[in-house]
Swiss-Prot record:
Identification of the protein by name: tRNA-specific 2-thiouridylase MnmA
Location(s), subcellular: Cytoplasm
Highest taxon of the lineage: Bacteria
Region described as Interaction with tRNA: 160-162
Gene for this chain: mnmA
Classification via SUPFAM superfamilies: Adenine nucleotide alpha hydrolases-like
Binding-site positions, ATP: 19-26, 45, 137
Length: 398
């Protein structure tokens, strides 16, 4: 007989480690599992703070969060541990964040944190503690497949769905992970936290990158990669110099404001040439890309990736966390994989993720994804499939 976490055994005989960030989501997760009788252990990762800040309420974002996690653990009566992962986090997340910006990319540090820290090191720690699962407060779901493995599923609350940030999760990790909030809405989570009397029930959600609480990510990049702050030229598609800039780190693909150049028509950042320290700008129509070259592809769909792709796999992709999935074709090419966007997409930025889904809406299954290495318009891409032959495009158009 399986318990509510789809694990064999009674809840009281099942140890579950909960990754507690100090926010309402992970706190409600811990309280819910405790109320269901599980042997819950809370762990908070100290990622970017030092010394007394971990013990002093309100010292900084990380210090406050650790204080809140401890408070919740005490309230619900579970053991709680704080693990110092600062060095690991700096090497795996912060340094790669700065490297990515220096290369002219727009990184997503939350993906790297989940991939390199939470779902690898923390998961290993949970196993060492004798846990049967690691639970988090992410808004995603998972379900058991016929072969016993687990699939990653979008959250019921579409506005809160975090599947984009978890595409790099491996099959082995999915087998051990649980997401109790996947079928809940944010208001329901807050109501649950109030029912348990948690002090964080009305705590504001974090809006910034956790290690950049001021929102000035350029400060981090300047400290670690000062060459990314070197000035350069702003040029048009023909290479004509239109102006100058204080460093490519200040720009991202699709940006319109803050260019500091006069033009009769609106200009947008089309790409960043880190080698020549150039910001290439042009009209909005030049932003539309149809072909995406991927790197570090992770596949969690059925079977082996190459067999699933074959001569081309029709699916849906999301190229930014805030955008809806759209029809696409995934193809194997020499040295990697490419995605052809059926209808094109504006502002496709290297460094962002391209996440695969089996449907455009609802609780779709996440099939994997990869990081965007480069993008190109249709004029230099492979010929697209005829729209009439694409059921995915028909589904998008309704």
């Amino acid at each position: 007989m399986l318990n509510s976490l789809d694990l064999a055994g009674r809840p009281q005989d099942t140890r579950v480690v909960v990754a507690m960030s100090g926010g309402v989501d992970s706190s409600a997760t811990a309280a819910l599992l405790k109320s269901q009788g599980y042997d819950v252990v809370g762990i908070t990762l100290q990622l970017y703070d030092h010394g007394a800040a971990t013990h002093r309420k309100g010292a900084c974002c990380a210090g406050q969060d650790i204080h809140d996690a401890r408070d919740v653990a005490e309230r619900i009566g579970i053991p709680h541990y704080v693990l110092d992962y600062e060095s690991r986090f700096r090497e795996s997340v912060i340094d790669s964040f700065a490297d990515s910006y220096a290369l002219g990319e727009t990184p997503v540090p939350c993906i790297e944190c989940n991939r390199s820290v939470k779902f690898r090191d923390l998961l290993a720690t949970a196993r060492e503690l004798g846990a049967s699962a690691l639970a988090t407060g992410h808004y995603v779901s998972s379900r058991r497949l016929a072969d016993g493995s687990r699939a990653l599923i979008c959250a019921a609350d579409r506005d809160r769905d975090q599947s984009y940030f978890l595409f790099a999760t491996t099959r082995e990790q999915l087998d051990f992970l649980r997401f109790p909030l996947g079928d809940m809405t944010k208001p329901q989570t807050r109501d649950l936290a109030r029912q348990f009397g948690l002090s964080v029930a009305d705590k504001h959600d974090s809006q910034d990158i956790c290690f950049v609480p001021t929102g000035r990510y350029t400060d981090v990049v300047e400290r670690l990669k000062p060459n990314a702050m070197e000035p350069g030229e702003i040029v048009d598609l023909n290479g004509r110099v239109l102006g100058s800039h204080p460093g490519i780190v200040h720009f991202t693909v699709g940006q319109r404001r803050g260019l500091g150049i006069a033009s009769r028509a609106p200009l947008y950042v089309l790409r960043l040439d880190a080698a020549r320290r150039r910001v290439v700008v042009g009209p909005r129509e030049a932003l539309r890309m149809e072909r995406i070259v991927l790197r570090d592809v992770n596949w969690i769909g059925d079977g082996a990736l190459d067999r699933a792709v074959g001569d081309g796999l029709e699916l849906f992709v999301r190229v930014r966390s805030t955008r809806a999935p759209q029809p696409a074709w995934l193809r194997a090419v020499k040295g990697g994989y490419e995605v052809e966007l059926v209808a094109g997409e504006e502002g496709v930025s290297p460094g962002q993720a391209c996440v695969f889904y089996d449907a455009a809406e609802g609780q779709a299954r996440v099939l994997g994804g990869g990081f965007i290495k480069s993008a190109a318009p249709r004029s230099i891409a492979e010929p697209a499939h005829d729209d009439a032959a694409s059921p995915a495009l028909a589904a998008m158009r309704g």
